[in-house]
Amino acid sequence: MCSISQLAARIGLLCAMVLPSICSAGPTAIVIHGGAGTIEREKMSAEVEARYRKTLAEAVSAGHRVLARGGRSQDAVIAAIVVMEDSPLFNAGRGAVFTNEGEVELDASIMLGEDLNAGAVTGVKKVRNPILLAERIMSNSPHVMLMGEGAEAFAKTQQLELVDNEYFHTERRRRQLEHVIARDQDLAAIEPVTDAYESRKFGTVGAVALDQQGNIAAATSTGGMTNKRFGRIGDSPIIGAGTYADNNACGISATGHGEYFIR
């Protein structure tokens, strides 16, 4: 089998996959994504490309290590997504896009194919890793989805790390917001130039994994749409739209135009 870095290079910058491997208990696999689309090479410097490849390789390796030691698929997808949430490169966690009010609001979800259990969170502003909160909602509450301040209050009871909203802010995302507001349109309508192009193509992160026990898990995390208003919620925290897993079918983590997926 080729190395993680070789594999990521072969299948493209925005998606990386560990090919199924055979072990005594059964095959395992993990797939990750860092947002919809692909970027033309002439629009990305070698330095920026290397940063994305490195982080994607770290993310997929983190998930693969969990599976290789016999761990659960849910822990594998969480491990992979935490790496991407902690990176300023993606529209999830640190480095996520700004709302019209100049804040970062985060969504995440996870679903298990074994029993169709799921957890989701939307509109949180202080939870460092929203995917960890989605998992706690699934595992430690009777609910499927929590939102906003209530979700953050639950996060405190779970001893999850809370941060100031400024932790998520990056200068690149602020410039993108200013550009969008100046043109009085949302990011989906911007022509593919400079930072606007990069942001349109890089975004929501996700992972799907199969563990040695044959269980599938899928998870997704995002900051949503640049310049979003009025509490807009996309597909990422919606079970069956942004995330889905069923051992009898497949695992899905979606990225793209959320309203279409929800419909």
Q: Where are the regions a protein language model picked out?
A:
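Alpha/propeptide regions of enzymes that mature by internal proteolysis
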Residues: 25-263
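Bacterial N-terminal signal peptides
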Residues: 10-21
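N-terminal secretory signal peptides that target proteins for export/translocation
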Residues: 1-9
